[in-house]
């Protein structure tokens, strides 16, 4: 008998428009057993090759098939300390599941759903930690920082994490909405790190509150910079500075971190208009649009300069956005935002067509000379982010010039994540190697931790 791919239960698409509760539930134990039985246990598992942190996927699925849930958890956590997070936010269709043999002619094994189930229902094994006497400072508490902190602490080093915001988690906290990543899940992972002995300090902006040189003077043997990329990329068009224009980072931070628009006690203002245009087509654009629906905008549209085929967002996020009433308007390139008394009063777009492929492999949008206007009162720009140069500038002022590329990202050895400064490493969005997402940031954290451990061996 052929077993069909098991589906998680989802919250009603109308009901979820007005709450921030998780959209998806876990598979049931019975579904987990059925889904695990679908794995072919290939001799050369392509799924593992597609995983940036090399989780031994067939092995943990075999453990599930044999009703050994704890063993499945142990196998995953040998290489990933964040299974509950990755099971929810990783682009599995382009990585592990995208490489699954079953997916060639049918439906891939639901690896992400299985990983999430294991993460939610198991705890990390307690390991004996033998102190090495070495100290490591980690700048940033996002995916790369959390992952590196776990691996470095297991090795016995004293690990101190410095976070610029008042809450821990980085983009997992301020960027990804709770309907995708429940905060209880994130808090549990951080609590586990604290139990291991990792020390955290919030409201510390490295480069301003304290410098790299001061960290070294304070006795840190190594510094790992994983402060993210918090500077939004804007459109550079007329009207972009009007009231009612937000970067996606600002909009999501106000709602996710500060409670604006969803917490009556929030002191962070957020003017809720009627019609919002979200510019972009990635996961952040989907998060912003779906969040806008939930805080009360009457009409939410995503405008993208290519076609649906080229959307870089996860297929699941696109589907969920459509189900929740988000409109998609393709081949629209922003030209101007109209001004009325200092506020957004509509937007002008040029209609595009697709030309030859660009460096990304996607067909390049080309203007047609035809224009349309959209009646909107709010604009959210989700076109990506760049690195904040505050750490590099403060280091340079103290005689530690960190080499960066033309876009301002820290240049690193792709395997070790080492910089040109001795004992200073960098990873995640501040020094990206490959696509910018949670699992690649975790991979960077693991590579950095491995190189740091080798360097600190006595």
Ranges and model annotations:
Residues 71, 130-131, 135-139, 187-237, ...:
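Feature captures the FAD/FMN-dependent oxidoreductase FAD-binding
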Residues 16-35, 56-88, 105-129, 255-256:
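Ferredoxin-type iron-sulfur electron-transfer modules in oxidoreductases and energy-metabolism complexes
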Residues 135-160, 285-293:
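N-terminal Rossmann-like FAD-binding beta1-loop-alpha1 element of flavoenzymes
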Residues 430-458:
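A conserved FAD-binding loop/helix module that cradles the flavin
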Residues 115-129, 188-208, 232-295, 404-415:
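Glycine-rich dinucleotide-binding loop and its adjacent helix/turn
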Residues 41-66, 85-118, 160, 164-167, ...:
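Iron-sulfur cluster-binding cysteine motifs and their immediate structural context
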Residues 241-273, 357-434:
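FAD-site-proximal beta/loop scaffold in flavoenzymes
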Residues 161, 165-196, 200, 289-336:
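Rossmann-like dinucleotide-binding cores of NAD(P)H-dependent redox enzymes
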């Amino acid at each position: 008998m052929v077993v069909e791919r098991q589906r998680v239960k989802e919250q009603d698409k109308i009901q979820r428009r007005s709450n921030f509760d998780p959209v998806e539930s876990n598979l049931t134990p019975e579904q987990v057993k059925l889904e695990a039985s679908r794995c072919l246990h290939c001799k050369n598992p392509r799924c593992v090759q597609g995983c940036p942190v090399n989780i031994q996927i067939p092995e943990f699925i075999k453990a599930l098939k044999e009703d050994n849930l704890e063993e499945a958890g142990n196998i995953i956590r040998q290489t990933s300390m964040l299974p509950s997070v990755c099971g929810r936010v990783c682009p599995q269709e382009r990585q592990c599941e995208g490489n699954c043999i079953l997916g060639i002619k049918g439906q891939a094994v639901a690896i992400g759903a299985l990983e999430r189930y294991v993460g939610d229902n198991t705890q990390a094994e307690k390991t004996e930690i033998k102190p090495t006497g070495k100290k490591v400072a980690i700048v940033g508490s996002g995916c790369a920082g959390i992952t590196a902190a776990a691996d470095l602490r297991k090795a016995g080093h004293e690990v101190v994490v410095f976070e610029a915001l008042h809450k821990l988690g980085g983009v997992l906290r301020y960027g990804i909405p709770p309907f995708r990543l429940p905060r209880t899940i994130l808090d549990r992972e951080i609590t586990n790190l604290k139990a291991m002995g990792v020390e955290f300090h919030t409201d510390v902006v490295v480069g301003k509150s304290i410098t790299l040189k001061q960290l070294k003077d304070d006795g840190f043997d190594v510094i790992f910079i994983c402060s993210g990329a918090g500077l939004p990329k804007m459109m550079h068009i007329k009207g972009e500075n009007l009231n009612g224009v937000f970067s996606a980072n600002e909009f999501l931070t106000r709602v996710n971190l500060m409670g604006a628009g969803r917490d009556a006690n929030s002191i962070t203002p957020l003017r809720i208009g009627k019609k919002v245009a979200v510019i972009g087509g990635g996961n952040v654009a989907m998060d912003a649009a779906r969040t806008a629906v939930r805080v009360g905008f009457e009409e939410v549209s995503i405008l993208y300069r290519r076609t649906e085929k080229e959307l870089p967002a996860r297929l699941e996020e696109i589907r969920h956005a459509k189900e929740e009433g988000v409109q998609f308007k393709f081949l629209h390139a922003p030209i101007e935002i109209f001004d009325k008394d200092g506020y957004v009063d509509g937007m002008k777009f040029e209609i595009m067509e697709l030309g030859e492929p660009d460096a990304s492999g996607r067909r390049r949008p080309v203007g047609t000379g035809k224009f349309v206007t959209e009646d909107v009162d709010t604009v959210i720009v989700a076109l990506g982010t760049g690195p904040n140069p505050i750490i590099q500038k403060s280091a340079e002022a103290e005689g530690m010039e960190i080499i960066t590329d033309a876009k301002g990202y820290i240049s690193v050895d792709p395997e070790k994540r080492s910089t040109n400064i001795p004992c200073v490493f960098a990873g995640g969005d501040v020094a990206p190697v490959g696509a910018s997402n949670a699992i690649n940031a975790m991979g960077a954290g693991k590579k950095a931790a491995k190189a740091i451990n080798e360097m600190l061996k006595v």
